[in-house]
Amino acid sequence: MKNIKNQSQEVKEPDLTGTYTARDYISWKAEELMELIHGRISRMAPGPSRGHQEIVMILGTVLYTHFRSKCKVYPAPMDVYLIHPNEDWKETKNIVQPDICVICDPAKLHDRGCMGAPDLVVEILSPGTAAKDLGPKRDLYEEYGVKELWIVHPVEGTIALHLLENGKYKILPIYAKGKTLQSPTFPDLKVDLDAVFADE
């Protein structure tokens, strides 16, 4: 393992074969972005494409404009510590960085990120992240109670809504270009998909 120094303290970069908690995560000084999924390190993909970032900007602007002071909207990188009720956040083994998250409970906001499930998460698929976004991360969002998950497919020009009902995600009809997405969790929130995928 490689050693790196921060001020007067020497910290080892994490062993990729180990299992860790948030307590370990916040002690690392590694420069690259990473997530913890079931205690295992998952490195973030290299810098996203221009198209990916344009969609982040468009959807982020729509969400920010809609929610204003009612909820907070954050793009990645934003650490989301997925914790169960009464669980010490430092003991969680699941820390993710959604492309966009919406948090309506101010009690979940912390200097380090979000402590608990956001109300709405947006994940934008790319070749390097699709398997993780559609697999373990989706399952974690379901387990920890993210009310609504948007899976954006830039190549197909679609958004799939996953709505949490009785602890399980129900996949709603897919929205495509020419359609207007309406959030079931936030009925006043509508998104024109032609605007989202204008350059795709």
Residue ranges and their predicted role:
Residues 1-200:
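Gly/Pro/Ser/Thr-rich low-complexity, intrinsically disordered segments predominantly at protein N-termini
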